Amino acid sequence: MRDPFVFDSRSEFCKKPFGAVPCGSEVVFHVRPLTRDGYSRCVLVARREFSGEEIQMELLPEAVDGERTRFTGVLTAPSEPELLWYHFRLIRSDGSTALLDQSGWQETGEIQSWQLTVYEKTATPLWFGGGVVYQIFPDRFCRLSLPDPTGLVGNRWVHENWNDQPVWVPDPDGEVRNRDFFGGSLNGITAKLDDLAALGVTVLYLNPIFESASNHRYNTADYLRIDPMLGTEEDFRRLCREAKQRGIRVILDGVFNHTGSQSRYFNADGFYPGVGAAQSTDSPYFNWFSFHPWPTDYDAWWGIMTLPAVQENEPDYRDFIIRGQDSVVRHWLRAGASGWRLDGADELPDDFIAEIRTAMEETAPDSFLLGEVWEDATTKVAYSQRRRYLLGHELHGVMNYPFRTALIAYLRGGDADDFRETLETLRENYPPEAFLSLMNFLGTHDTPRILTVLGADNVPDNKADRAAYRLSPAQRQIGLERLRLAALILFTFPGAPTVYYGDEAAMEGWEDPFNRAGYPWAQEDTDLKAHFAELARFRRSFPVLQTGELHWIWTSGSILIFARELDGQLLATAVNAADVPQTLSLPWPAPPARDLLTGQCFTPVDNAIPLTLPPRSGLLLQTDLP
């Protein structure tokens, strides 16, 4: 049975400092078993993940605190990045032992170890975690004119009606080929920079912009050419210049695990004038791919033959993407990009990611490297390898899918403590710089629209039904109320709040392609958009929301209250996700507070603020500590 009074890895009474620690630093452990249980010795037993070495350290009986004996020890963390999996062995004077792990006391059974992340402390650009990110699917954001797809790679066609639904019905071969385009462009994004600045955006994350046969452009055809339907390299450079003038940076999507079968590197259909790997074993790109046998059978991303997988360990490929003086990574940083998001980081070797980081630091020292990782990035195992994403010299931050999953569950009737547990686990496991640099989001191009998820009663089983699905007025109202709460939490939680284009405008839609419709210019939900803009303004105005310490105040049932504290300033987010009012006495040993959302003032009585939170409502309380 678990007894947090004996040891709680998240309490500084038991372990200090909290969470992950830099290489070579000291970690103090206190274990407090009941004195009557007769333990005379306590040993910390730790296993190093990467070397396999076992560490044993004796904790010494230091004092008796009431009914408990306190054992204390100081561990020096390894000098190299590592994951330590530890538990305690307690020994009585008669030689009998007991094991203490995350599940509690163990006599026998599989050990459920605590995790200690040991990382190499490196510089992390602050502009990402301290900013507001806006994700754009370029083909669907803003069209200035109807493009002509004639002569471009892929059998493309363009919707004349911007408000059409993206094609989802398979062709006669049973494939959805994503060849329908809407004509959004880089110049269209540039034309909307003032709107984005007014929304509070400081970082643009663009889905792939390089020449590709498909509208999503994840099947890259030419890494060094902007897709002509989006514009030119000069258009990209101008976008970056104009964005910089408004305090906005641009991050690009790097798809480096696979290319398109119609790319100039593979060239399966002979579209490009050069010789691709599918055309000749003498192709300069032949060694980039793994054939068995050539030319029809080859490794492909998840077995999708239009996405041939590249061999990242091939020196020529690494030179092209990373090492060369005009490599893909370096070229686009010099053209104005401020960072890269690595698509499918699990598919890339650790040393490949580390080389990208090095090339970025050499080319643009303040650039940011983000990774697509769907789980806890410190415990992720891919292809039987424990990954080192956040241990130093790889990723600065990752996409925070666990945040989205936990937040949706809470807002749809789950327990606030489950949300706390999910995020507190990440906070404990991640280096603090990485936790503050997480890309927190409510939706992306790979997830259903957040308004639909929060408003719908259930997910239709049939894709045709999902294509035709629209929230009823009652469902939409509930969804909007929940979405306002989701945005409140998103913008006040540690990490970079990220808005998927159109979520702030109340766009609906299930999965791809229904979540990738054209932005509804002049048809937005202006109230919701103003709410997002106001939250972004608060985040910009109060540094505490960017780097402040996180405190959990109340996490029970439908009530979620957490605070951020920095340099004497305190902001608390209070949310009631229930369909009924909730009354509580909020502990508040501080001066009177003001709700930034309504201007209402609250005066504490006996170090508490009496609150009644209406159904599906929230507050953002601000005060200055004495």
Regions found by a protein language model. Give the residues of each.
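Glycan-association/targeting regions that enable binding to alpha-glucans and other polysaccharides
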Residues: 1-134
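Carbohydrate-binding surface patches
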Residues: 16, 28, 553-587
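Conserved, mostly hydrophobic/aromatic
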Residues: 31, 136, 196, 206, ...
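C-terminal beta-strand-rich structural cap/linker in extracellular carbohydrate-active enzymes
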Residues: 35, 605-626
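Substrate-binding/active-site clefts of carbohydrate-active enzymes
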Residues: 137-202, 209-335, 356-362, 379
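Aromatic/acidic polysaccharide-binding cleft in carbohydrate-active enzymes
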Residues: 139, 383-384, 436-471, 487-525
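Active-site-proximal helices and loops of the catalytic beta/alpha 8
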Residues: 240-249, 257-258, 263-274, 328, ...
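C-terminal accessory region downstream of the catalytic core in glycan-modifying enzymes
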Residues: 521-542, 585-606, 615-617
